[in-house]
Amino acid sequence: MPSLVGSEMCIRDSLYTVSAVLTAKEKELDRAEKRVGLRTIELNRERDPYGMNFQFRLNGVPLFIKGSNLIPPDSFITRFDDKKLEALLDAAQFANLNMLRVWGGGYYASDAFYDACDRRGLLVWQDFGFACQAYPFFLPEFLENVKTEVHAQVQRLCHHPSLAVWCGNNEIEDMHMAWVHMQKYVQWTEKFFYEILEPEIRVEDPDTPYTPGSPVGIAHNEGVYSDNVGDTHLWGVWHGLQPMQYYRKRMTRFCSEFGFESLPDAKAIRQYAKPGDYALNSPVFNLHQKCASGNDKMVYYIASRFHLPRRFWDYIYLSQVTQDTCIADATEHWRRHKGQCNGAMYWQFNDCWGVCSWSSLDYYGNYKALQYGARRFNAPLSVSVEDSKERFDVYVLNDLNARQTVTVEYELFDFVTGTLEKEKKKLLLPPVENAVAFSREMAPLRKKYDLRRTGLAVRLVQNGACLQQKTVLFDQEKRLQLPGAKLHTKVEIQKDQLCLTVTTDRFARLVHLESSRTSLPFSDNYFDLLPGQSHTVTLAADPDCTLRELAESIRVKSLSDVPFDRDPLHAAAKRIKVYLSPVNIGNAIHHGKLSKDIEL
């Protein structure tokens, strides 16, 4: 009996080789082979109590999509070889992604890409090559050329079990408001994506789901900005300068784009900048930033949470942890409301050159904080906290199609002395269902403890092993009494890796390990340690240096090692200046508004 292709796991054993041989008079003339997998994939767009669904089902099982948007991995296509492809998809698996969106503003990926996604169980959202502008579909020659392209790509890719959906375009409907004097383009955009394209696809591929564009509503230009139908691109945070908690106000059915910029790794910056360029608004840094006011926006958001750092290099660290916090908060919010929301695909996964951007993986292969964070917040079995000024609720999130028995521990701790109170509970989770383990009111805690020096730690334990620890603080770091933490790192050289055990005396916020000798990832990074706690991290050997050299290159720090400018007026002045720039005011008006649900 053939095995069905699944997700959340490697599917190598579920792939089969199909061969076709052309013969004449018992002589072989030609042969073709393809690797295929058996599965059903559906995109459920039916009405439900929340509006109109946008939910993928794999073999009949609802999926919460944890994905990212893939841009061209290099500005020069031929520089992207098979080794880089494997590293790229290794990073996607490390981040616990189950879908990559091949963005329509780039180019169609190679056969090797789709083969590798098939092997890894990574689903692919495939945009056609139309994005962000008007196309002259009304010209017969152009339309016939487009149809030829569509048939060629569909025929090439439709056998891949990783292919989950054909998407007509990226954000073209979103651009229509600027096409006042281009009504012919508007009319033909609707005609092509809503009437012409899908029948052309069905000639080659009768089964794979199709959606006219992203974002999409219920019809052309109907509900494109609505949360209760279709998929959404949410840019209230970042472009709209909304606070990072803004996403908790949005109960979208499926968020296929949302993002936040950060600086790349220091090793990446040294590839394109010299010491005299190390300033966020230097000519070189402005050149390597393609978002208007992007570097200033990073400062704007860093200052909302931290004091501003005195050293340039600490902007890398703080921009990356701020990016991770933003994407994690949104993804966990939507995962907690699985069923109403069915997917979170952050923008963007990778870079095509050395740049400050929305990516979790920089051009040179260095993992940003978001890569490590995604491994945690996208884990198929994970813990999440929904917190407010009034209460907090501890959730266990289960995306696995099997019952899970887990123990959830919650601990209130003092930043210096450690445990204040602790409780644990055993839970039996049904397949692909979430559960609330604890709910607590904040008022009694405020009376009992000084919350400026108190944190909440939640642990998820299964079969005696701690799968995950999550820390929640009750205010922004700049308002808390975070102590100076002394970190001790023990480095052990093993056969093919380093083992690093980090221990702290007091609460250590956002412990960061880095190496100047390798871009290979640590097994974990940017984590918190409670007073007296230790955590062991591994780093694989790099063929370009010895393990001894690698060990000597390791540097460890936490938030308490960052020297800050603690002048609140300085930070406030910077935030006001960023907000009042004309481009940011316009974006704030456009992107900051809450959606209005469309009536069905």
PLM region spans:
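Surface beta-strand/loop "capping" patches
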Residues: 50-55, 375-408, 477-504
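Active-site neighborhood of glycoside hydrolase catalytic domains
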Residues: 119, 136-223, 325, 364-365
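Active-site-adjacent substrate/metal-binding segments within catalytic domains
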Residues: 19, 27-133, 143-165, 286-324
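Beta-strand-rich binding/interaction modules
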Residues: 1, 392-429, 434-439, 454-461, ...
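Substrate-binding clefts and catalytic carboxylate motifs of secreted carbohydrate-active enzymes
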Residues: 166, 199-202, 211-214, 218-229, ...
